Regions:
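PLP-dependent amino-acid enzyme catalytic core
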Residues: 1-343
Length: 343
């Protein structure tokens, strides 16, 4: 029988999907790694698994122990599901501004959810810093251990992509990948995949796709962390160099406005049947830019990070989009003209 022994073995080995319309428009083969097909429906399942396994190996976490994390949602979902499968509880600290869909999913997965005001990283009450203090507090009372996942600075996150995502991309493209592009939240995916691909062929181009409001585009182009503008995307956009980003082999950086990313998301759903989230729009826009820079005939890979249904109240809400002065696809408000044949 072909089977996977439990949810843990179902993480990873996701397919590469050719994105037909952007491939045709650029003359390149643009491929999306379908990370929404992981059990927790996002790329963050990989980081969750490696972070938990690392804590277990170090003896910091035993069955019945608690995993604490500050997250915009997807990492928390991954930690909760992997934790359930391995016998751990999860406590998630989340900015109250995150989508209701993510909050509901975290609760559905059994996580204890703590919502806090959204403040910058410099503020001591930033959600990440609160989660760190909470982990230290719980470690004093939890007999089976309480660990802070610390996805931003725990390099077990990056190692998950060095060992799995990067090699998968290399093997799936028969070693012919020319470029890899994605946005940064913790930095684990971009750095880990970049390191894995560069180790196999140094000429592979590694590109950062940065949303407005983040500071990394400025850092990788001028050496100064500086942000401008804003974005409705969630879970990406970083204002500092995390431990996962240290020594990341980034060759080029692009700054992507929402007005460039969102039409790609809507087009992908309408014409190719893929419903993806905002960060994936940033990723695809970055892939298009790299494809245009390299020229026709190249193979570019990016990350399809999660499902768009996780952002339905914002990303696919006409009123919200208009409020933010962003494009609204006509089909989103289409009314049926079909007459129902009642008897």
């Amino acid at each position: 029988m072909q089977l996977r022994d439990g949810v843990i073995e179902a993480i990873g080995n996701t397919p590469l999907i050719k994105l037909e319309r952007v491939s045709a428009a650029t003359g390149c083969t643009i491929l999306g790694k379908a990370e929404f097909m992981n059990p927790g429906q996002s790329v963050k399942d990989r980081a969750a698994l490696f972070i938990i396994n690392d804590a277990v190996k170090r003896g910091e976490l035993r069955p019945g122990g608690v995993i604490i994390e500050g997250t915009a949602g997807n990492t928390g979902i991954g930690l909760a599901l992997v934790g359930n499968a391995m016998g751990f509880r999860s406590v998630i600290v989340i900015p109250e501004t995150q989508s209701q869909e993510k909050k509901d999913t975290l609760r559905l997965c059994g996580a204890e959810l703590i919502e806090v005001p959204a403040v910058g990283y410099a503020n001591p009450n930033n959600y990440v810093k609160i989660s760190g203090r909470l982990a230290a507090q719980l470690a004093q009372t939890e007999k089976n251990g309480a660990v802070w996942a610390n996805q931003f600075d725990n390099v077990a996150n990056r190692q998950g992509h060095v060992e799995t995502t990067g090699p998968e991309i290399w093997n799936q493209t028969d070693g012919k990948v020319d470029g890899f592009v994605c946005a940064v939240g913790s930095g684990g995916t971009l750095a880990g995949v970049g390191m894995a691909l560069k180790a196999r062929r140094s000429a592979v181009r590694i590109a950062l796709a940065d949303p407005m409001g983040a500071a990394l585009y400025s850092y990788y182009t001028t050496g100064v962390l500086k942000s401008e503008g804003s974005s409705i995307t969630e879970g990406i956009g970083q204002g500092r160099i995390t431990k996962n980003l240290e020594n990341a082999p980034i060759d080029v950086a692009y700054q992507i406005p929402d007005s460039e990313a969102l039409p790609l998301i809507f087009d992908l759903l309408e014409h190719e049947g893929l419903c993806v989230g905002g960060s994936t729009g940033i990723n695809i826009a970055g892939a298009v830019r790299l494809a245009k820079e390299l020229g026709p005939g190249h193979i570019i890979v990016t990350i399809l990070a999660d499902y768009g249904t996780r952002y339905q109240s914002k990303l696919f809400n006409p009123a919200f989009l208009r409020e933010k002065k962003l494009p609204v696809p006509s089909w989103l408000e289409r009314k049926s003209s079909i007459k129902v044949p009642y008897e």
